[in-house]
UniProtKB/Swiss-Prot annotation:
Protein name: Small ribosomal subunit protein eS6
GO cellular component term, pick one: ribosome
GO MF annotation list: structural constituent of ribosome
Organism: Thermoplasma volcanium (strain ATCC 51530 / DSM 4299 / JCM 9571 / NBRC 15438 / GSS1)
UniProt-listed HAMAP family: Ribosomal_eS6 (MF_00512)
Amino acid sequence: MANSLAIIADPKTGKTYKREIPSERMSSLIGRKIGEEVDGVFFDLVGYKMKITGGSSVDGFAMRPDLQTQGKKQILVKYTSGYRGKNGIRKRITARGSIIGSDITQINLKITQYGPTPIEEKKDDQQA
């Protein structure tokens, strides 16, 4: 399993930050679902709490909160994320489930509780 990427959104400032997740920490995130809160220790942010809002796999398929599975699934959709159909046209698309698996390369997070130190003060931070 390669290193994954965490995209952390700060609702106060409107900025996003990238953090690389080592494979040993990523293995402890496997099995978590979209909407769950995780501790900021996974991303070297002590005291922070974050909510998982989405992600994408190695293949580039987006995670969907309405699919309660870990793998890929083909679903029939009208107008939704992943497809913008017109006038009732439906299409079968491939999407990821809402459970984090070993093939997820990007996790999107939103800060829900702030820690003692601001994210901007971290030296190894890259702003997205």
